C-alpha cells in the first residue's frame, strides 16, 4: 500500500490548558511531516483573533506550512482582506476559504452589510491578490443547506472556478461515500484534487452528535460496534482500527492525500498514521 501524504486540522486554544494541549498535539504530530496544517475559525467568527495568533505562532515556531481558515461571517470585505493581508505579511500563504457557520442562535447565514455575500466572492477576492494557495470545503453527503447533491457539486465547481486549487471534505464513515462523490465531481468537470477529511473518533457520543448536525450518514453497524467496544473498554482500539481501515480503503481506491480532524487530541491520529506507514522522519543528527 502506498504511503499517503497527510495534513492535520487544529483549533485555536481559548484557555491556558487548551494551549498546552494544542502544543502537545503539534509536538506529537509535526514529526510526521504533514503537507500542511490548518487552523479553524470559530462559528460566527468567534475565534478570529485567536486564529490569527495561533496561525502566526505555529508558522514562526515550527516552520510548518500553516493554512489559515478564513470566513465571510460578521466582517466587512475590508476587515476580512485585512486579516488575509496580515497572514501574508507573517509569511502564511495558504488559506482555507469558507462561508463560515453563523453565530449560535441565529437563523442561518446573513451576510455582513459590507461583507462578502458568499464563499465564492471571498475566494475570488483572495485569488485576485495572487498571494495565496486557496483550499475550500466539500461535502460528500451534501451541505445541510444545499437543495440537493447536484446543486452542492455545482457550487463546489463554482468555488474551484473562482480560484480554489483543492477541496477538503467533511468527514464520512465509509469509503464508498467518498468514491461516489469523487466520481460525481469528475462528471461535473471538477478536476481539482479532493482530499478526504478523516475524523478519528475520540468520543462516539460526540462524533455521532456532530455527524447528525452536519448531515453525515451514520451506518447502523457503527452504533453496535461502539456499544460493545465501550462496554469492553476498547473504544480507542476500535476507533484506531476503523479509521485505519477507512484510510486503507481510500488509498487502495487511488487517494493520495488524507486530512485528519485532530480535535487537538493527537494520539489516535498518530496511531492511525503509523498504521498507514507514516512515521517520524529521522535524521543522522537525531541518532548520532
Name each model feature, range by range.
Residues 2-5, 33-36, 62-66, 91-93, ...:
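Short, well-ordered coil/turn segments that N-cap beta-strands
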Residues 5-23, 66-78, 135-151, 227-241:
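Active-site mouth loops of central-metabolism enzymes
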Residues 9, 37, 87, 159, ...:
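Conserved, mostly hydrophobic/aromatic
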Residues 10-13, 40-44, 69-75, 98-101, ...:
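Active-site beta-loop-alpha junctions enriched in small/polar residues
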Residues 17, 113-139, 183, 188-245, ...:
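Active-site pocket-lining/capping segments in soluble small-molecule metabolic enzymes
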Residues 17-20, 45-58, 76-83, 101-126, ...:
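Active-site-adjacent beta->alpha loops and helix N-cap segments on the catalytic face
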Residues 25-40, 161:
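Catalytic domains of carbohydrate-active enzymes, especially glycoside hydrolases
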Residues 145-164:
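Active-site glycine-rich loop that binds ribose-phosphate moieties when present
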Amino acid at each position: 500500500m502506498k504511503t499517503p501524504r497527510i495534513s492535520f486540522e487544529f483549533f485555536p486554544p481559548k484557555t491556558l490548558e487548551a494551549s498546552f494541549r494544542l502544543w502537545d498535539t503539534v509536538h506529537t504530530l509535526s514529526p510526521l511531516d504533514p503537507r500542511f496544517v490548518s487552523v479553524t475559525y470559530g462559528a460566527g467568527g468567534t475565534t478570529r483573533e485567536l486564529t490569527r495568533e495561533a496561525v502566526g505562532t505555529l508558522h514562526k515556531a515550527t516552520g510548518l506550512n500553516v493554512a489559515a481558515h478564513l470566513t465571510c461571517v460578521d466582517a466587512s470585505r475590508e476587515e476580512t482582506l485585512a486579516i488575509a493581508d496580515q497572514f501574508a505579511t507573517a509569511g502564511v500563504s495558504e488559506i482555507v476559504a469558507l462561508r463560515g457557520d453563523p453565530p449560535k442562535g441565529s437563523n442561518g447565514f446573513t451576510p455582513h452589510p459590507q461583507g462578502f455575500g458568499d464563499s465564492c466572492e471571498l475566494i475570488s477576492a483572495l485569488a485576485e491578490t495572487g498571494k495565496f494557495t486557496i483550499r475550500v470545503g466539500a461535502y460528500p453527503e451534501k451541505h445541510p443547506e444545499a437543495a440537493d447533491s447536484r446543486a452542492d457539486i455545482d457550487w463546489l465547481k463554482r468555488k474551484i472556478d473562482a480560484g480554489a486549487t483543492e477541496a477538503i471534505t467533511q468527514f464520512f464513515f465509509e469509503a464508498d461515500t467518498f468514491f461516489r462523490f469523487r466520481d460525481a465531481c469528475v462528471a461535473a468537470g471538477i478536476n481539482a484534487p479532493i482530499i478526504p477529511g478523516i475524523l478519528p473518533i475520540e468520543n462516539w457520543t460526540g462524533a455521532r452528535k456532530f455527524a447528525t448536525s452536519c448531515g453525515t450518514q451514520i451506518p447502523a453497524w457503527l452504533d453496535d460496534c461502539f456499544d460493545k467496544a465501550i462496554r469492553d473498554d476498547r473504544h480507542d482500539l476500535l476507533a484506531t482500527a476503523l479509521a485505519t481501515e477507512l484510510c486503507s480503503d481510500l488509498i487502495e481506491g487511488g487517494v493520495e492525500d488524507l486530512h485528519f480532524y485532530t480535535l487537538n487530541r493527537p494520539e489516535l491520529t498518530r496511531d492511525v498514521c503509523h498504521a498507514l506507514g507514516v512515521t517520524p522522519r529521522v535524521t543522522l543528527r537525531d541518532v548520532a
